[in-house]
């Protein structure tokens, strides 16, 4: 009789929709979405699931499709399980087969009409800028070191606040998107300085391809007093994509979480993990370095 790590693979089981909370350090991956060429989170996760439940090829759906080099602290995914593995055993079973840069934090069963992407009411990203004058080896994998100027965070936040609401954000959409429109609703933005770190949080119903990195690139130009708020508003309100040129590096961006009408994972699962002081806490300490 076939078994997988103590699970009877011949035992009849109902279809179960499994939701996972996962984290990954995105530096060495070609983004979330499976590709013909490239090392992607989706492909690795689907292969690991199939190695445990080979009754049907796994199809994993994510709340947000992160680009190459982007990290995730609280990515939410789902897949349908046809095998006998108990829901609570999926994290340990998968973590034994995944690379250390991908970790499964929690698993719960959802109804078959629940969808990690379509059921989400918001996604939240965080971008970290290290505005210190000297390089920091330990911050480099998680931040954009930007120090030609001391950034003016008050101007940056003022510009960002003007984005709140539902708008056409074509100016912040990279080419290659298959979306039929560029409307989305930004629900919240926040930019806070903690010593030499600028922490930019943005929450929206959804994000366009490359949107956050293009937006942060513009905000940094404002913080350096190279771009006025009026010119920034003209660019995005008139959808002048050709004027939005510099994208912030992927390494400073982290998918913090997706939100749903009802909480699905244990409380604070996203916010109790390393590097909590940098990426995953609501209120970083006043002095970090």
From Swiss-Prot:
Q: What class of enzyme is it?
A: isomerase
The UniProt record lists the keyword tRNA processing: yes
What does the annotation say about its assembly with partners? Homodimer.
Name used for this protein in its record:
tRNA pseudouridine synthase A
Binding residue positions for substrate: 125
* UniProt keywords, alphabetically: Isomerase, tRNA processing
Say yes or no: keyword Isomerase present: yes
Q: What is its EC number?
A: 5.4.99.12
| Entry GO MF terms | RNA binding; tRNA pseudouridine(38-40) synthase activity
Write down the superkingdom of origin. Bacteria
Classification via InterPro entries: PsdUridine_synth_cat_dom_sf (IPR020103), PsdUridine_synth_TruA (IPR001406), PsdUridine_synth_TruA_a/b_dom (IPR020097), PsdUridine_synth_TruA_C (IPR020095), TruA/RsuA/RluB/E/F_N (IPR020094)
Tell me the active site: 67 (nucleophile)
What gene is this protein translated from? Answer: truA
Spell out the family assignment given in the record's similarity comment: Belongs to the tRNA pseudouridine synthase TruA family.
Catalysed transformations (reactions): uridine(38/39/40) in tRNA = pseudouridine(38/39/40) in tRNA
Q: Which GO terms describe its biological process?
A: tRNA pseudouridine synthesis
Q: What does this protein do?
A: Formation of pseudouridine at positions 38, 39 and 40 in the anticodon stem and loop of transfer RNAs.
| Cross-referenced SUPFAM superfamilies | Pseudouridine synthase
């Amino acid at each position: 009789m076939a078994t997988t790590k103590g699970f009877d693979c011949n035992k009849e089981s109902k279809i179960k929709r499994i939701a996972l909370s996962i984290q990954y350090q995105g530096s060495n991956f070609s983004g979330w979405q499976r590709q013909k060429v490239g090392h992607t989170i989706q492909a690795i996760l689907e292969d690991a699931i199939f190695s445990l439940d080979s009754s049907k090829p796994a199809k994993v759906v994510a709340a947000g499709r992160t680009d190459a080099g982007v990290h995730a602290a609280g990515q939410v995914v789902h897949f349908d399980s046809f095998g006998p593995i108990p829901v609570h055993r999926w994290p340990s079973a998968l973590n034994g087969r995944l690379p250390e840069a991908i970790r499964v934090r929690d698993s719960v069963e959802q109804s078959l009409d629940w969808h990690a992407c379509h059921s989400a009411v918001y996604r939240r990203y965080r971008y970290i800028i290290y505005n210190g004058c000297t390089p920091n080896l330990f911050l480099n994998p998680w931040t954009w070191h930007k120090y030609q100027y001391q950034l003016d965070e008050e101007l940056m936040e003022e510009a960002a606040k003007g984005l709140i609401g539902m708008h056409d954000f074509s100016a912040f959409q990279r080419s290659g998107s298959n979306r039929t429109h560029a409307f989305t609703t930004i629900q919240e933005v926040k930019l806070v300085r903690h010593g030499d770190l600028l922490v930019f949080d943005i929450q929206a119903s959804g994000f366009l391809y490359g949107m956050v990195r293009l937006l942060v690139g513009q905000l940094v130009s404002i913080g350096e007093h190279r771009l006025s708020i009026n010119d920034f508003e003209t660019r995005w309100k008139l959808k002048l994509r050709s004027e939005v040129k510099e994208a912030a590096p992927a390494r400073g961006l982290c998918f913090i979480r997706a939100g749903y009408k009802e909480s699905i994972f244990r409380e604070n699962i996203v916010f109790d993990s390393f590097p909590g002081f940098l990426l995953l806490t609501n209120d970083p300490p006043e002095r970090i370095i």
